[in-house]
């Protein structure tokens, strides 16, 4: 199976005017498909042309000049301690017997001349090198084997166009050999590894994107989901990581977040580290829903790992929140506070769905007697966005029930199934001739836009939606039966490059011609937890996340807002 290091496509508005003399446009991404950085090198690097979906290096008139590109294989190039071991290229915390192996390198090139490929250590020592003669004509794939045992500390992979050559490059890949562990386990493994690449043990936080510097823009909600996914990955019947590692992650993150300044108890959505202190990132908010996601995650992880003291401290954090200060005139809780920690945001959690449910449950932990106002448009997610109907079920089993909930009268399981049916039908109805309809892709949800420079929310209620966020496939996977249907879809996605070994792409257009390879922390969290629930259901394993929810008296008491008769033994049964 091939994992792109980088496919050199560029997204730009076709009406954009290119200034005379421009040789390189900014790629719509500034990162590799591995979630790392890249750059240019050589005395003729400024002659490299990148104006379309290929790199062009014309050196036929420069017999003494060379130029090319380097790509970090693990972390940022400036982080020498992060390297790739070709015998186990996923993060080293993942068990060796579950890791893939890198056994080949492939480059797609055209033109005439000589091309050199090198793999180097962090110290710049050449660990592997090959010369490729490009003999003219159209693009061709050049595949070269590598010995994984000789590449245990690889830091960069570099291609260089040699003097006197005219060569074009459209992509660079690593050939992977994967253990035979089953499609359901593979989906969780790849999704968890993607999330783990976003995590920094140095800070205790998950980066919003894997390729950015640790501490520059970290996400609190995804950090909580990472801790929970790690607790799930450490369960004996899964065994991706050790229980000791999961406990260390839990303890480190709890300590790191415990040092944050809050706003009336609310945690920041995003944080950054400056002068050794981590605090809210300017221009972002103290967020009710992101606090809820983090705190639900940490409470469940503490119970799963037998760290009751942590679980109790998480409950205490919730009880210290000043919920009356967050309440809007209509009775709903606000989305939070501005970064000054004082100014209340005017919009509140009143739309029906998983986000509002988690916020309400958080308040009920603090005040068991509170009765929030009814949600707006019960049973109907805003815009028909997929993730809204599934978020709550990443944490709690109760919403697998078709009993009308006591708060809004919603039959959650039916609503979730109806959403899945609408998502699956949308492409064939709106885009019947598309690749998405042909391959059975779906996922009108939320995430980065197609350019990777802004947030996008789609949904089945909107016409002509042409951007798919496939995290919804894994979030809703446990709803589909038989499980083999999901398996076949995952196989098709793997074949089309939408679910490579590094995890699902962030988004893809309905025609299948454009996708965003960004490794983002939030959707990686959604994917990992969704894949875990799918794995346990497909194999009939105990779902440790759901069992922890059932064992928590605080969560059981809070859940009576929706299901007064639900006990710890029958939730979601």
PLM region spans:
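Ser/Thr/Asn(+Pro)-rich, low-complexity disordered segments
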Residues: 1-22, 30, 54, 173-573
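Beta-rich carbohydrate-recognition modules and glycan-binding surfaces
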Residues: 1-3, 7-179
